[in-house]
């Protein structure tokens, strides 16, 4: 059986696309050793400069170590964004493809053909291979974005919002439930806009109601809410849901009114605060956000306001990014902030974020929680790694459970645990039942 090596870079939306490719390549044995592979695939990220550099390095490394006669394919966002330049600059790559043909990768490999379709998503896919877990899956509900954020180039290569049909999404979840999956994270560039392009006024609410009807879905969460398309009605539907947990992931990017205007984020500070307070008031809520520092126009005064806000409003998780100057964005032509200042601000805000995350972890000590066993931990085979049921898979932390204390524990199982300590950035716990 021929072997395939697939390197998936970037976000969890890219991971879904990679899993679709693995589904199309079921006749191949998957290997994590590139030198053994007959086919090598890099699914690239082209969002910001650091991600682009990582993608290029990965491609060049595989060009160096691939075995003679193997096929190297490069797919994904970077290819979609810089198609002409990369085809010219990477003569050792055999197949090029963008973001619309993942389900056709087997045909492209068989014919050694490159392909770039106008479509940037798949409506329906029945052969996807879920990686890394036997209980959790990401479900992509739309592709593209209608927002006009000043710093973001995604609409330039992903296109405008294109929502999947609700029944197609339901069918995918039902299929995965039949295969044993029970925990689902619903993702998109802007999940709260779902359905607006196909005439659904409250598309995400409608989707939530349909997912709740599926027998076997135990846990679900929504990622990537956008402030201007999120309202209290949607939040209340999540809060009242018997299936969707009170997990609120809404990147705010900044909190200063003038910066929000410069960044073309739509809502101002007051509207964002109202949404965040509603989220925080929900029982057992978990709040995640994203912040950009160093965007053109960010004065010391605006930055200080952001720092004070993050110290006062306690998020559970904060992802912090340095502004990246990107072509095809409004901020590309703006007066840029020097890199040394951006780096200084990034370091300061990262420390604030780390303290907030640390406090969120420590607040769990002594509590009883529902958790899922993910497998042996990153610390080695003496511990099982687990995540709280409310957390997203991999990104929100790992809980260590001593393997020697356990009998008949099932990987992928849902258990009641007691958090006992927080050591070295990780929670320790024991299974109660």
Curated annotation (Swiss-Prot):
Domain of life: Bacteria
Gene3D superfamilies in the record: Methylthiotransferase, N-terminal domain, tm_1862 like domain
Cofactor binding summary note: Binds 2 [4Fe-4S] clusters. One cluster is coordinated with 3 cysteines and an exchangeable S-adenosyl-L-methionine.
InterPro entries hit by this protein: Elp3/MiaA/NifB-like_rSAM, Methylthiotransferase, Methylthiotransferase_CS, Methylthiotransferase_N, Methylthiotransferase_N_sf, Ribosomal_uS12_MeSTrfase_RimO, rSAM, rSAM_horseshoe
EC number in record: 2.8.4.4
Subcellular location: Cytoplasm
Swiss-Prot/TrEMBL cofactor(s): [4Fe-4S] cluster
GO BP annotations listed: tRNA modification
Protein name: Ribosomal protein uS12 methylthiotransferase RimO
Name of the gene: rimO
């Amino acid at each position: 059986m021929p072997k395939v090596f697939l390197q998936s870079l970037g976000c969890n939306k890219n991971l879904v696309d990679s899993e679709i490719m693995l589904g199309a390549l079921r006749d191949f044995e998957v290997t994590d050793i590139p030198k053994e592979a007959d086919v090598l695939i890099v699914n690239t990220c082209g969002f910001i400069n650091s991600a682009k550099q990582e993608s290029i390095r990965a491609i060049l490394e595989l060009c160096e170590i691939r075995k003679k006669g193997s096929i190297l394919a490069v797919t994904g966002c970077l290819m979609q964004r810089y198609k002409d330049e990369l085809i010219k600059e990477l003569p050792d790559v055999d197949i090029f493809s963008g973001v619309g043909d993942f389900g056709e990768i087997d045909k492209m490999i068989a014919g050694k053909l490159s392909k770039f379709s106008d479509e940037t998503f798949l409506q329906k896919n029945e052969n996807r291979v879920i990686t890394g877990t036997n209980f959790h899956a990401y479900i992509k509900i739309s592709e593209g974005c209608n927002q006009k954020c000043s710093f973001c180039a995604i609409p330039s290569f992903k296109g405008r919002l294109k929502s999947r049909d609700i029944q197609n999404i339901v069918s995918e979840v039902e299929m995965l439930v039949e295969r044993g999956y029970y925990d689902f994270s619903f993702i998109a560039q802007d999940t709260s806009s779902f359905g607006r392009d196909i005439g659904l006024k409250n598309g995400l609410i409608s989707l939530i109601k349909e997912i709740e009807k599926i027998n076997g879905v135990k846990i679900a969460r929504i990622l990537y809410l956008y402030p201007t398309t999120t309202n209290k009605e949607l939040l209340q539907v999540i809060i009242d849901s018997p299936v969707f947990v009170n997990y609120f992931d809404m990147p705010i990017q900044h909190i200063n009114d003038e910066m929000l205007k410069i960044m073309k984020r739509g809502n101002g500070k007051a509207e964002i605060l109202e949404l965040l307070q509603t989220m925080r008031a929900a029982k057992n809520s978990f709040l995640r956000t994203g912040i950009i520092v160093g965007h053109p126009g960010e004065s010391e005064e605006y930055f200080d306001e952001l720092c004070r806000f993050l110290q006062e409003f306690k998020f559970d998780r904060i992802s912090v990014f340095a502004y990246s100057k990107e072509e095809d964005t409004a901020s590309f032509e703006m007066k840029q902030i020097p890199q040394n200042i951006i780096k200084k601000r990034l370091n300061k805000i990262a420390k604030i974020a780390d303290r907030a995350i640390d406090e969120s972890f420590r607040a769990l000590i002594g509590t009883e929680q529902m958790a899922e066993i993910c497998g042996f931990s990153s610390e080695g085979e003496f511990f099982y790694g687990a995540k709280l049921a409310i957390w997203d898979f991999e990104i929100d932390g790992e809980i260590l459970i001593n393997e020697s204390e356990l009998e008949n524990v099932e990987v992928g199982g849902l258990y009641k645990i007691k958090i006992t300590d927080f050591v070295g950035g990780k929670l320790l716990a024991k299974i109660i039942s």
